[in-house]
């Protein structure tokens, strides 16, 4: 493989498409990024134009190679990672979408979800798909398109229409309509896939009236799915060899491939995933059961918990409260006081996610006394991110029976040393921050590289996974438990605040 010097990861996110080129040592040699339009037709509705997703993603690929003066014949393989759950339906003949992509954040299918609950499907969905009944997942979005685009369900039955998550759509376009596939991680987010039988679930397809003919073939996350020509006909054919949903790609990029290993991504919200190996653990604590990647990209399972407000609560301090002018300043102000002076901030601006799942919770600040100043509130807001992470982790440990030895972290907020140290303090666990922060792209690159022999195995990659800094707990157990019990008390008082009839 000597002439093939690079792997490309395509990272198709919610607000932008990126291409990341890596060399054999997993160093990033070139990055290109393009933002694209968010479409909000009605309150709570979110769409993307699938053609714009494709145009932005394909142009970043060309640009990233051009920037570093790399020829396409030097590329060993392409890996794809993507925003999960987002739905595209298109015509098999023309490759044209019949409707905009319905994005994971879109809430338009709430009524369909209520109907599934009324039909008594909730327990079955949790057991078969590992998910909760929520508009977040793909299945109800596909039903909505088939219900609202005239004649589409009949066309789908005749095999004229195809469905895919974003990975499937990109591969269809990259292979000129020759390949219609997805991987196990993306399939596990559709609410149409049986995560135990590893096949599309007929009961779910019947419940949502979705024809099987429109569904992609489901494959492993690390294998050659097809080839793409960069530079049109006569160009070099490059294998597309890795696919994983963004959070599963980050888990793999952090090399959390053994049972009990976990990562937390601190972005707008937090996404925590714990690998549970070959057993699918059904959560009794409000977590999702999902498919992750084992050491060779094979099927492993994971528990997943989402916190809605992480980086977003720091933005609130900046934009609405005007307590800081830059998110980076939060660390400086938080360290100007020795503690929060008894203050707790519960950032339940849009309700609370795992493990509470209370859409009626609202944000609150508790424990105010005359001596409290803005620095205490800034510090308490940062601390709330760590407390919410502990909430999810406690649920994971209770569900899995696995004690976590270290938490690997990534995402924008991990640059905040105060937050990372407090996270370690409040968990009583080591927190490991990697040298390379692009772990999502790294995961897609690793999956593709392993499939084509660019890297032989994970041992080779283990050496490249350098931990830039390790944070260790610096407070006593009694102090840790005392602070956490204060948080639990604060959360309890923020729950069920909003009047239901308003909702």
UniProtKB/Swiss-Prot annotation:
It comes from Klebsiella pneumoniae (strain 342). The keyword Kinase applies. InterPro entries: ATPase_NBD, Carb_kinase_FGGY, Carb_kinase_FGGY_CS, FGGY_C, FGGY_N, Glycerol_kin. Its EC number is 2.7.1.30. Pathway: Polyol metabolism; glycerol degradation via glycerol kinase pathway; sn-glycerol 3-phosphate from glycerol: step 1/1. GO terms for biological process: glycerol catabolic process; glycerol metabolic process; glycerol-3-phosphate metabolic process. This is Glycerol kinase. CDD domains: ASKHA_NBD_FGGY_GK (cd07769). Belongs to the FGGY kinase family. Homotetramer and homodimer (in equilibrium). Heterodimer with EIIA-Glc. Binds 1 zinc ion per glycerol kinase EIIA-Glc dimer. The zinc ion is important for dimerization.
């Amino acid at each position: 493989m000597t002439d093939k010097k690079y792997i490309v990861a395509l990272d198709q996110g919610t607000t932008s498409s990126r291409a990341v080129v890596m060399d054999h040592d997993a160093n990033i040699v070139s990055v290109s990024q393009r933002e694209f339009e968010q479409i909000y037709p009605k309150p709570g509705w979110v769409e993307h134009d699938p053609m714009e997703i494709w145009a932005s993603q394909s142009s970043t690929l060309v640009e990233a190679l051009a920037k570093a003066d790399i020829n396409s014949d030097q590329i060993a393989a392409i890996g794809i990672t993507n925003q999960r759950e987002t739905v595209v339906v298109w015509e098999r003949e023309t490759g044209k979408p019949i409707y905009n992509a319905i994005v994971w954040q879109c809430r338009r299918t709430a009524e369909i979800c209520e109907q599934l609950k009324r039909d008594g499907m909730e327990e079955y969905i949790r057991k078969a798909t590992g998910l909760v009944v929520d508009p977040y997942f793909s299945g109800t979005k596909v039903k909505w398109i088939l219900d609202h685009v005239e004649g589409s369900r009949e066309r789908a039955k005749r095999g004229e229409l195809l469905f895919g998550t974003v990975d499937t759509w990109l591969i269809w376009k990259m292979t000129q309509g020759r390949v219609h596939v997805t991987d196990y991680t993306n399939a596990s987010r559709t609410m149409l896939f049986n995560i135990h039988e590893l096949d599309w679930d007929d009961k779910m397809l019947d419940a949502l009236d979705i024809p099987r003919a429109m569904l992609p073939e489901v494959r492993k996350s690390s294998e050659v799915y097809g080839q793409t020509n960069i530079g049109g006909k006569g160009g070099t054919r490059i294998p597309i060899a890795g696919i994983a949903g963004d959070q599963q790609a980050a888990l793999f990029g952090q090399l959390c491939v053994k049972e009990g290993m976990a990562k937390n991504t601190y972005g707008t919200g937090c996404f925590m995933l714990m690998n549970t190996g070959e057993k699918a653990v059904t959560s009794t604590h409000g977590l999702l059961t999902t498919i992750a990647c084992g050491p060779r990209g094979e099927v492993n399972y994971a528990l997943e918990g989402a916190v809605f407000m992480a980086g977003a609560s720091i933005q609130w301090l900046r934009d609405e409260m005007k307590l800081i002018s830059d998110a980076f300043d939060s660390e400086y102000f938080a360290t100007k006081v020795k503690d929060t002076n008894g203050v707790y901030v519960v950032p339940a601006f849009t309700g609370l996610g795992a493990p509470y799942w209370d859409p009626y919770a609202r944000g609150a600040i508790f424990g105010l006394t005359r001596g409290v100043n803005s620095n205490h509130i800034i510090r308490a807001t940062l601390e709330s991110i760590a407390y919410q992470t502990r909430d999810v982790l406690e649920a994971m440990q209770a569900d899995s029976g696995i004690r976590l030895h270290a938490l690997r972290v990534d995402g924008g907020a991990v640059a905040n040393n105060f937050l990372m140290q407090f996270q370690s303090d409040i968990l009583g666990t080591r927190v490991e921050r990697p040298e390379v922060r692009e772990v999502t792209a790294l995961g897609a690159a690793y999956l593709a590289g392993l499939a084509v022999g660019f890297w032989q195995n994970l041992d080779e990659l283990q050496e490249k996974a350098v931990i830039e800094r390790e944070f260790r707990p610096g407070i006593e157990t009694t102090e840790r438990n005392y602070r956490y019990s204060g948080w639990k008390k604060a959360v309890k008082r923020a729950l069920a605040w909003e009047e239901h009839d308003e909702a």
